């Protein structure tokens, strides 16, 4: 499903992926980041003791409705989030997905050698 989502988003420019057409529909860029935040928060952090959060600010920006995890950006205002840039979200997404898949394929064993936030562009 993740590959299909990325394929659908690929022809869109970064500006296209920023648009929030109505308050109840989140931007494409936000959806890509939210999935990565979900993997990081609920799969990687609880299961990999050496895992480091990619960016502490992303929890607020990309949490959808998990109030027990912390505060969040209002849904109607997600289109106002211009940073991080799409390139950084794409890199973070690839790294988080790689780590999640590696962890699942290895039965929960750590694969952190492939994951390093410094490999992604900064905003």
Features from the language model and the residues they span:
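Alpha-helical scaffold segments that form or flank carboxylate-/histidine-based iron centers
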Residues: 17-37, 80-89, 110-123
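Alpha-helical bundle segments that constitute or directly flank the non-heme di-iron/ferroxidase center
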Residues: 1-11, 33, 37, 91-94
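Conserved alpha-helical segments that form or flank metal/cofactor-binding pockets of metalloenzymes
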Residues: 28-71
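Solvent-exposed, flexible loop/coil residues
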Residues: 16, 21, 47-48, 58, ...
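Helix-loop segments that flank and shape redox-cofactor active sites
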Residues: 3-27, 45-53, 102-115
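Acidic/histidine-rich alpha-helical segments that form the ligand environment
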Residues: 64-111, 118-121
């Amino acid at each position: 499903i993740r590959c299909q989502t990325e394929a659908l988003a690929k022809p869109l420019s970064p500006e296209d992926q920023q648009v929030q057409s109505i308050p109840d529909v989140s931007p494409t860029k936000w959806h890509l980041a939210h999935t990565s935040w979900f993997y990081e928060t609920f799969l990687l952090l609880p299961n990999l003791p050496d895992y480091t959060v990619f960016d502490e600010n992303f929890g607020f920006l990309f949490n959808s409705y998990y109030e027990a995890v912390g505060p969040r950006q209002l849904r109607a205002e997600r289109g106002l989030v211009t940073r991080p840039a799409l390139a950084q979200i794409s890199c973070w997404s690839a790294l988080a997905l790689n780590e999640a898949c590696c962890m699942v394929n290895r039965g929960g064993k750590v694969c952190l050698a492939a994951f390093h936030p410094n490999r992604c562009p900064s905003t």
